[in-house]
């Protein structure tokens, strides 16, 4: 029983530290379009340097998107990632 509890605690801590891919808003509908430079916009969760590189949400009245600094457990530092979030959420 102890090993099972230890594994569950480890998994929970790993998710908290590294985050979850859905935290970036990947499941929220977004518009994938070509940018003026010929590249495709970056989807939520992708690395970015400017907000205009990121795909925009399909519902801009309720969702906001852009390039934000976010902690990466894999890199051990803050990195810029495209993100879409619900405006009413305290996480936005």
Swiss-Prot record:
Position of the signal peptide: 1-19
UniProt keyword Glycoprotein present: yes
Entry keyword set: Disulfide bond, Glycoprotein, Ion channel impairing toxin, Knottin, Neurotoxin, Secreted, Signal, Toxin
Entry-linked Pfam families: Cys_Knot_tox (PF17486)
Glycosites: 62
Single GO MF annotation: ion channel regulator activity
Cellular component GO terms held in the UniProt record: extracellular region
Location within or outside the cell: Secreted
Tissues expressing this chain: Expressed by the venom gland.
Cysteines paired by S-S bonds: 41-55, 48-67, 54-82, 85-92
Family statement: Belongs to the neurotoxin 21 family.
Entry domain remark: The presence of a 'disulfide through disulfide knot' structurally defines this protein as a knottin.
Biological role stated in the UniProt entry: Probable neurotoxin with ion channel impairing activity.
Protein name per Swiss-Prot or TrEMBL: Toxin ICK-15
Species of the source: Trittame loki (Brush-footed trapdoor spider)
Record lineage: Eukaryota, Metazoa, Ecdysozoa, Arthropoda, Chelicerata
